[in-house]
């Protein structure tokens, strides 16, 4: 699949995820931890991608080794950013990181975050009581 098509699909997915989170009541004004996922069977290539992501201003966690269902091993890390659920920011980050993945020949596996809403605040209030 071409990079242009991958970007187009990722941008559409970004909008769907943001709309779903906000539609479910996640707080639009909160700052979110956005974790962009990378993976590769080649640790050296993955390490180069991590360095590139760091140079772009992302926090990068240590690579982890995981065993897949078929018994093969894969390495993965997250490039982390903190910002609002803003589609323009997500699109820009995804484009930058997908270019890194393409350059280093590793997989960009999308991004994830956590719901921020009333139940988190209620849990905090219960802990303080």
Curated annotation (Swiss-Prot):
It holds the Pfam family RraB. One of its GO terms (molecular function) is endoribonuclease inhibitor activity. GO terms for cellular component: cytoplasm. It is found in: Cytoplasm. Gene3D superfamilies: RraB-like. Keywords: Cytoplasm. Interacts with the C-terminal region of Rne. Globally modulates RNA abundance by binding to RNase E (Rne) and regulating its endonucleolytic activity. Can modulate Rne action in a substrate-dependent manner by altering the composition of the degradosome. NCBIfam families: PRK11191.1. Belongs to the RraB family. This is Regulator of ribonuclease activity B. The lineage of its organism: Bacteria, Pseudomonadati, Pseudomonadota, Gammaproteobacteria, Alteromonadales.
């Amino acid at each position: 699949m071409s990079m242009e098509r991958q970007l187009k699909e990722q941008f559409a997915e970004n909008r769907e995820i943001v709309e779903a989170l906000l539609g479910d009541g996640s707080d639009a004004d909160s700052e979110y931890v956005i974790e962009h996922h990378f993976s590769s069977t080649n640790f050296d290539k993955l390490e180069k991608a991590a360095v590139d992501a760091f140079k772009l201003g992302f926090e990068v966690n240590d690579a982890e080794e995981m065993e897949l269902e078929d018994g093969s091993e894969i390495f993965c890390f997250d490039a982390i950013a903190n910002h609002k659920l803003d589609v323009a920011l997500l699109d820009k980050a995804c484009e930058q990181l997908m270019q890194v993945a393409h350059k280093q020949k590793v997989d960009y596996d999308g991004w994830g975050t956590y719901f921020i809403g009333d139940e988190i605040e209620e849990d905090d209030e219960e802990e303080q009581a």
